[in-house]
Amino acid sequence: MSKVLVLKSSILAGYSQSNQLSDYFVEQWREKHSADEITVRDLAANPIPVLDGELVGALRPSDAPLTPRQQEALALSDELIAELKAHDVIVIAAPMYNFNISTQLKNYFDLVARAGVTFRYTEKGPEGLVTGKKAIVITSRGGIHKDGPTDLVTPYLSTFLGFIGITDVKFVFAEGIAYGPEMAAKAQSDAKAAIDSIVAE
């Protein structure tokens, strides 16, 4: 039995293409892997605090007493990391906003990236500590950006996930959604076909 963690990060709730596709992924996964456990965390409905000068102090090893706000941030960081490490498959629904990921997803990464916990520095360079996992990124875009200079989502997520130890990463693209109903329907159809292929593996 596998454990699947789904991270939603769109601010558009039910209107979101990435949310709809991640819901489709969950439906298909449950149909093919009924014994698996699926956890869904909506980072827009339950937002993560923005990292600032006070909160960053909670995430660094120190003997200094923590403020109540820092204690809350550290507890949330511990919770998010424990959840991440406890799951085998990580599904990230990542819409493109202004060429990059949403603020909601970036805030999550800022609390998950902790030296000595999810990665460490060694004499040979950084080493990821979140290993043995697979990641599937479902990314929706209004325009066509794949393999072009305006796609900052794909390299960023590949780099971040690899940095913490998740190197088995597959991407599902839904592009051209803003180009009209016909193009949007094709984007959804192509993305669902890619999801079907991944689920069937």
UniProtKB/Swiss-Prot annotation:
Gene3D superfamilies referenced in this protein's UniProt entry, alphabetically: 3.40.50.360
UniProt GO molecular function: electron transfer activity; FMN binding; oxidoreductase activity, acting on NAD(P)H as acceptor; oxidoreductase activity, acting on NAD(P)H, quinone or similar compound as acceptor
Coiled-coil parts of chain: none
Residues at which FMN binds: S10, S16, Q17, S18, M96, Y97, N98, F99, S140, R141, G142, G143
Cofactor: how and how many bound: Binds 1 FMN per subunit.
Class of this enzyme: oxidoreductase
Signal peptide per UniProt: none
Pfam family, one: Flavodoxin_2
Keywords recorded for this protein, A-Z: Flavoprotein, FMN, NAD, Oxidoreductase
Function statement: Quinone reductase that provides resistance to thiol-specific stress caused by electrophilic quinones.
Subunit structure: Homodimer.
UniProt family annotation: Belongs to the azoreductase type 1 family.
Descriptive protein name: FMN-dependent NADH:quinone oxidoreductase
Gene: azoR
